[in-house]
Amino acid sequence: MSIKSIAAKIFAHKIYSQTLSWANKPVETQFEVFKSLIESAKETEFGKDHHFEKIKTFEDFQKNVPIRDYEDLKNYIEKVKVGEENILWKGKPIYFAKTSGTTSGAKYIPLTKESMPTHVNAARNAILHYINETGNADFVDGKMIFLQGSPILTEKHGIKFGRLSGIVAHFVPKYLQKNRMPSWETNCIDDWETKVNTIVGETINENMSVISGIPSWVQTVSYTHLTLPTKA
């Protein structure tokens, strides 16, 4: 067992214990998060429009903040996109994640410095919970494929724009960088078919132990792997 796998087991147990403490008091845990979010956003335009200063309970929130879709929030989003501050969240976001827009065109989701860690930690913690439950940590010594959109970002009004998976690529922990595949150059390829073939070419003879990404992407890469011969 390697030092890395031993460390992974120790860290996994720590994260599991933290999650268990939250799970044992779910209402209290969620209410603390609720209060923190309301307090942080009460001076924003959205917070003022919806009387966040008066919201003390979940019932207050239901009365003041109606359920709505993206189009109903688009006016706020457009203000943030051109650099206005304190609209949906304090200050302005560091990123905008652009979705494919399957229903009504592209959608832009703001990502703040407070929210970015949750995107990384959620994936990390899923793996750590698996390690804690099974005791299997040997896979951390193998290569790991992260199927992502292009990490190349554009910038407007001090905010960077890109695909969510491409944005998250900038936040892969240092301790995973050595095991990470494909290469940065391959991740930057826009054409999907070319990208898949390049990924397979880079990884087919490696000891791959983890693959992550949108299920359809994982399926495509896995199928392509199966159709190509490996080196003897």
What would you call each of these model-derived segments?
Residues 227-232:
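A short, hydrophobic C-terminal helix/tail in secreted or cell-surface proteins
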Residues 1-29, 34-51, 55-226:
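Active-site phosphate/ATP/adenylate-binding loop shared across adenylate-forming ligases
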